[in-house]
Amino acid sequence: MSTGQEEHLDSKLENQISEEENQSQNQNFPTAIEDSIQASIEKLDEVDDEINPIEVKDEFPTTIGTTYDILHPREPFPKRIKLEETETEPDSNGIADNDQTMVVVPPKKPQLFYTPLKTGLVYDVRMRYHAKVFTSYSEYIDPHPEDPRRIYRIYKKLVEAGIVLDPSLAGINEIGPFMLKIPIREATSEEILQVHSEDHLKFIQSTEDMSRDQLLKETETGDSIYVNNDSYLSAKLSCGGTIEACKAVIEGRVKNSLAIVRPPGHHAEPNTPAGFCLFSNVAVAAKNMLKNYPESVRRIVIVDWDIHHGNGTQKAFYNDPRVLYISLHRFENGKFYPGTKYGDLNQVGEGPGEGFTINIPWRSSGMHDGDYVYAFNKIIQPVISEFDPDLIIVSSGFDAADGDVIGACHVTPAGYGYMTHTLKGIARGKLAVILEGGYNLDSISKSALAVAKVLVGEPPENTITLRPQAEAIEVVDEVIKIQSKYFKSLRNGIPNGIFEDVYDLADVEKSNYKLVNIADPIRSHQVEKLFNEKEFINIPIISSPSNGEKPPFTTDLPDQLEDLIVASPDIYNCTTIILTIHDPPEIWANINPTNGVIETNSTMVLEHPLVQIMDKIQKEKDPENQEKFGYLDINIPSFQLPIPGTTSESSTYNPIIFAQEVLLYIWDNYIAYFQQLKNLVMVGFGDSYQSIVNLYGKRPSNEIKDLIKGTVAFLNRTTLKPLIPVMDESMVDWYYQNSIIFTSNFNTCWTGGSGAGNGNGNGNGNNGNSSNGGGNKSADSNGHDDFSKRPRKKFGRVIKAKTDGLCDVIQEKFDEGVDFILDSIEDYSSSED
């Protein structure tokens, strides 16, 4: 294309655009330009065929896009198109500096209700006035765990982190860009009486005028509380501050809130202060929200992650379907404070409130981030989402934090941050975090800071990668089985009928179902193989003596007695007997993930360990050893089927007690009469092994030492049983020297999970820290002074396997166990020679 042609086309384009622009309105500006440019380009098609079409394509693209494409064409472009001679060039942001700036979307106010708001903070130094009356200098230097400095240290930590701006730590009102100070007030009597009785309120009120002696008496006789003349004021401020923290969230003045208050509240019951708590702060606040905001607050969730069960909060809403109470706490079968069964997993509410209480009771100390996160992911998050609350209140005790000797657990600041972050994603972020317990000043301040950061908008500090402990998985599974009755979100992988309800199918009046305990045919298969291949025989049990003697069994017997005990055909004439006692075998199977049904075609049972022992001994025993070997096998059923069609207790059968009694029965009625017997080796598998240790403490030590040459046990997480001799203290050394106990690497004797320390929670708080759990300094139930050491001699010679699970422990340590059996027998034989 020639230069003259280009100039001619440019001139025509400019004239065309100028004419059409003058005739159009401002609002049709983009459309007019595009129409005119398109018309001009169509005229280009009529140009002489001598013009190179490729050059035209390069210089004048035939695809016309947006107005911006026209005003800012790709290079090379011979000349920029101007709409008017006086038009200014757009700036770097594409905005022209004149009155004709194009507006496509007018500026709008951000459609955000949450992000622009601050996090609310409740704090008042007057709550520090509640303090224990000192009676000695030692109480001053070793203060009560519920220390007034708790709230000060948390507030100070927030200031040190820059989240709160208060250099003088005076509790000022203007605290910076991240948090908004919520004015605190005293709770009114009317508000407190929504939860507590009038007598309860009058008692706390009376402490204002009590004498020193009266205050000391109430402190001494109360259930882990102390009082002074300022306790009533502090308690009203703590309760009122909790109400205001929730109120500010509901009214939209803050996006969420953190109430640094004391005294705590979740142990205070309607009629009784307890566990350092005077008024049930969270319960009073929840009642207040439901009453005063009936349109916006219909359902509330209370998540209590204090290490102690919130018995007071649970009682306040036990029959109220509007409040879902969830508690994670150290329980220890009701032995940990508050020391009742009220926090067990089967406590689910009553009346209209049934199904609106969820307890997740840890069996021991030592729980960590992985355990709490697992419970949140499997139970708490799906259940709260299904409940769909209008407000979430957290009873935030930090006594499960790492470093707190009372809780003796290991939740880190990152763990608390993760839990807070999870709850922020529900109920449109309407979350109020209220301080409860926590008695290590460093731990409580660091944990509260992590929560505050997440409330303000920071993500959790770290990703939680720690795996849950087996104990936590088991507890969570038990809770899911119970709560799946009430929450659909927990039913994935759970059978449509609760396991206990399956027995109703066997009611002959209602159906033709006949139930079979799978353990019975498995045992029948085991003994059939022993009968056919090893020619074993049944050993009978006579449960009812004919001569009027006391029955040998205090529990009901299993149904299938004929296969319970089997032995070698010539057991009476054997000089060496290996006795095995075991639980029913483990079953490996694929489980349908939608309904929990076991897929039978993929179900496997490992070969009976006794058969493996017999084969290996036959191969490896000394050929010169002419001892006649015999074998005796005892199977201990795990439980007894209920009587079909009845609601009564079907059986008093207890597998642990039965195992102990049946082994004593075999010793007294069979082994004692084997005249040829010289060597006896005991081999235990699983929980049944405890019966062997029980035998050693119940029968004369000289008989035990003379006959038994060794003890071998294969355990998963079975609690170790100590040998407690009645008379002969040397039995402990004998047991240690002649035993080998293989355990899972997660057995509590190594992890300290079964009661590391004898802390009893809030305990009897009158004696300071010592009464609230000595924590990790005392020995655990498996005899440790330090978890890095081996268990004491009274537990036998304990060896830790590298694996977890009974089958894996057997597979790993089987050869070593059989070698120990052979060494025990052959060493004795050689010593006789």
UniProtKB/Swiss-Prot annotation:
InterPro entries: Arb2-like_domain, HDAC_PDAC, His_deacetylse, His_deacetylse_dom, His_deacetylse_dom_sf, Hist_deAcase_II_yeast, Ureohydrolase_dom_sf
Catalyzed reaction equations: N(6)-acetyl-L-lysyl-[histone] + H2O = L-lysyl-[histone] + acetate
Sequence ranges of Gly residues compositional bias: 760-776
Coiled coil: 5-52
Keyword presence, Hydrolase: yes
Recorded GO MF terms: chromatin binding; histone deacetylase activity; histone H3K14 deacetylase activity, hydrolytic mechanism; identical protein binding
Highest taxon in the source lineage: Eukaryota
Region (Disordered): 1-40, 760-791
Function: Responsible for the deacetylation of lysine residues on the N-terminal part of the core histones (H2A, H2B, H3 and H4). Histone deacetylation gives a tag for epigenetic repression and plays an important role in transcriptional regulation, cell cycle progression and developmental events. Histone deacetylases act via the formation of large multiprotein complexes. Deacetylates the YNG2 subunit of NuA4 histone acetyltransferase (HAT) module, leading to the reduction of YNG2 and NuA4 HAT at the promoters of hypha-specific genes.
Entry protein name: Histone deacetylase HDA1
Taxonomic lineage: Eukaryota, Fungi, Dikarya, Ascomycota, Saccharomycotina
GN (gene name): HDA1
